[in-house]
């Protein structure tokens, strides 16, 4: 009887030890699977973060005439001759510099399809912040075209050595915390979006310079029309840095064009 009891006790101990080993092995396996799962999630999370980072395009620098799309905006660098450089950044941001030029412009904006008026598109405004350093004749502005009638337009917030444009005065508009003088000029047989032809230029020129803020584009349009300066179907609205027989540089830290808001 004693021998059987000893044997039973030994067997029970072996069984319990075996169960403990099995349980520990299962626990270790569970921990391993959990660790692997956690590690896999961390790797996937890292991959997603890396992928999201890569969706932001690296800055692109161009030095000669080029048009294209970058950061959700149409862009253009144009010059007749001289040294130019434009670095395209995320969104509406860009930087530029120029020297020994005849005429050069750097811009980002929105192109339309010449089928709607500004009223049909909805309210248009531009928000921007720029470090602008011109040396000579230059201006910082909203720029664009309409068709039918063909009109080239400028809303100038800052300039270099010369305050444009020296045309026919059409009055003023007070908007966005400042007074703008309104002018109209005529260009005869000059380059345009429709080739060399004759067309009107409309200008709003701020009396006091600034290099950041909001430009309520549609309010300028309405003021022009109230003064007998009709606009046609929208072709383009852009934020523009332009130089003429000058040098300079500009860093457009941020720029956005809001339509229908």
Curated annotation (Swiss-Prot):
Residues 1-28 form the signal peptide. Pfam families: Glyco_hydro_11 (PF00457). Pathway: Glycan degradation; xylan degradation. One of its GO terms (biological process) is xylan catabolic process. GO terms for molecular function: endo-1,4-beta-xylanase activity. It comes from the Bacteria. Gene3D superfamilies: 2.60.120.180. The keyword Signal applies. Keywords: Carbohydrate metabolism, Glycosidase, Hydrolase, Polysaccharide degradation, Signal, Xylan degradation. Belongs to the glycosyl hydrolase 11 (cellulase G) family. This is Endo-1,4-beta-xylanase.
């Amino acid at each position: 009887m004693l021998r059987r009891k000893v044997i039973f006790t030994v067997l029970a101990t072996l069984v319990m030890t075996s169960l403990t080993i099995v349980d520990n092995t299962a626990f270790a396996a569970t921990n391993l699977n959990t660790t692997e799962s956690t590690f896999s999630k961390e790797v996937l999370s890292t991959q997603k973060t890396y992928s999201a980072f890569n969706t932001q395009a690296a800055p692109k620098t161009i030095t000669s005439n080029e048009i294209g799309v970058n950061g959700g905006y149409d862009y253009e660098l144009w010059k007749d001759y001289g040294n130019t450089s434009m670095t395209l950044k995320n969104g509406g941001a860009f930087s530029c510099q120029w020297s020994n030029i005849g005429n050069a412009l750097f811009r980002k904006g929105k192109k339309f399809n010449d089928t709607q008026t500004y009223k049909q598109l909805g309210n248009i405004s531009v928000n921007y912040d720029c470090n602008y350093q011109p040396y000579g004749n230059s201006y910082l502005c909203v720029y664009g075209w309409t068709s039918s009638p063909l009109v080239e337009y400028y809303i100038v917030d800052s300039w270099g050595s010369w305050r444009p444009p020296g045309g026919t005065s059409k009055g003023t508009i007070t908007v966005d915390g400042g007074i703008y003088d309104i002018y109209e000029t005529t260009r005869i047989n000059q380059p345009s979006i429709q080739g060399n032809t004759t067309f009107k230029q409309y200008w709003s020129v701020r009396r006091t310079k600034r290099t950041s803020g909001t430009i309520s584009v549609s309010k300028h349009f309405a003021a022009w029309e109230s003064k007998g300066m009709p606009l046609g179907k929208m072709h383009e609205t852009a934020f523009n840095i332009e130089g003429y027989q000058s040098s300079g540089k500009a860093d457009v830290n941020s720029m956005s064009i809001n339509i229908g808001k």
